[in-house]
């Protein structure tokens, strides 16, 4: 790599590995066990430490901090990892912290993600592909976020929670439980408001199947009887609805947290959402 791509004010420790066409702007610090793959760009004032790997064509903006130790009292200088995939955009003041002994020693982020200003990703988080975290989203430790998730600004997610694929969480919404795939959740204590029908339509999901899935999800969460029995009944009855089956699979493989559910008053919004989408174009 040509040294002309590295600003003279930046500090790159001996042992760091930089791929082809890596660009390092002013006042960056890169630790000795960092790997930057081809075409990575650090704008300026970026700090990357620890055993950290950044995938191809990821762009990191000023004052981001990647790979620092986890914010936990029991951390004892274990050698943990941070792995970030390709084509990510990591904006100003984003923090991504390394894994811990209690979570497999690794924080992992996939490809094609956008993390806006001030996002915090805690230790041992597992982030998928094509997610968008708006400004100042904060994830505690051990959180799993699946593909195509959108989280609105200033929202926070409780440790060990899971956020299912294609779901959307509104801004200013603390999430204390698992959010089902395709779910739409928000509120001062986030509740399930329905399914992310707009996002599903944009991704090409069948409209009729999506609307039917919304009704089935309401049956599962708001119906009578035992919750586990309602899941089993829906699994047998609606096995041809691929959206529902993905949601049921998520429910059957739950974490130790509860599921983000409808409030009784919020079920009316789900019904309204369903009715509105039935209106002619």
Curated annotation (Swiss-Prot):
Spans through the membrane: none
Keywords: Acyltransferase, Cytoplasm, Lipid A biosynthesis, Lipid biosynthesis, Lipid metabolism, Repeat, Transferase
UniProt enzyme class: transferase
GO biological process, one term: lipid A biosynthetic process
Catalytic activity from the UniProt record: a (3R)-hydroxyacyl-[ACP] + UDP-N-acetyl-alpha-D-glucosamine = a UDP-3-O-[(3R)-3-hydroxyacyl]-N-acetyl-alpha-D-glucosamine + holo-[ACP]
Record flagged with keyword Transferase: yes
Broad class of the protein's primary localization: cytoplasm
SUPFAM superfamilies per UniProt: Trimeric LpxA-like enzymes
Cell compartments where the protein resides: Cytoplasm
Coiled-coil features, chain-numbered ranges: none
Pathway where this protein functions: Glycolipid biosynthesis; lipid IV(A) biosynthesis; lipid IV(A) from (3R)-3-hydroxytetradecanoyl-[acyl-carrier-protein] and UDP-N-acetyl-alpha-D-glucosamine: step 1/6
Stored Pfam families: Acetyltransf_11, Hexapep
GO MF annotation: an example: acyl-[acyl-carrier-protein]-UDP-N-acetylglucosamine O-acyltransferase activity
Known role: Involved in the biosynthesis of lipid A, a phosphorylated glycolipid that anchors the lipopolysaccharide to the outer membrane of the cell.
NCBIfam families per record: lipid_A_lpxA (TIGR01852), PRK05289.1 (NF003657)
Quaternary assembly: Homotrimer.
Family: Belongs to the transferase hexapeptide repeat family. LpxA subfamily.
Protein name: Acyl-[acyl-carrier-protein]--UDP-N-acetylglucosamine O-acyltransferase
Source species: Rickettsia bellii (strain OSU 85-389)
Originating gene: lpxA
